[in-house]
Amino acid sequence: HVLSDAIARVKSMGFVHETLYQTENFSTVNLQDYIERLCNSIKSAYKTSEQEIELSVDAIGCNMEMEKAIPLGLILNELLVNTYKHAFIDRDHGNISVILRMEEQNLILEVSDDGIGFSESEEPKAIKSLGMTIIQTLVTQLRGTQEFTSMGQGTKFSLIIDLDYSQEK
């Protein structure tokens, strides 16, 4: 699994570059295209005949600088890979939702599922996996805030990036 996770991370960065090269502006990426392509790639990689996992994507069509789009895509990659690997154990179906929206000057990424969720002893931030470490590092890099919620069934991750603040150097 380590190798397939690494491949997914590299593909995530590759999608940003592919999306950039399809436009005439090489410094920003269309988030809707990027997020949809990334989600479809991960869905294809984890699709099995034993499970029917629905993945819905609702992403706004704004542009983002490449140096912010890459970490955002890597966060989404880690969340989706973890969801496919852990949320639907011993289940033959499930739902994953990815929403990317603007609220005032904030870009908000929400990834939720109706899987098995976390127990209180499995608080996501306390898990010392490579994927969780990557997520926390990238959230810090984006100067964002994150929140995991789980009520025993399903998990929701929210990332808020203040675009006004993140543009200040």
Describe the residue ranges of each PLM region:
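Short C-terminal beta-strand
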Residues: I99, G154-Y165
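Glycine-rich nucleotide-binding loop
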Residues: N95, G117, M151-S158
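Conserved short strand/loop->alpha-helix "switch" segment adjacent to the catalytic nucleotide/phosphoryl-transfer site
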Residues: F26-V29, K47-L80, Y84-N95
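Detector for a conserved hydrophobic position within an alpha-helical segment of the HATPase_c
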Residues: V139-T140
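Glycine-rich ATP-binding loops of the HATPase_c
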Residues: R143-M151
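Glycine-rich/acidic phosphate-handling loop/turn and adjacent ATP-lid/helix
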Residues: L107-M132
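Short beta-strand/loop element within the Bergerat-fold HATPase_c
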Residues: H93-Q105
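Short beta-to-alpha transition helix within the HATPase_c
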Residues: L3-K11, F15, T28-S44, R101
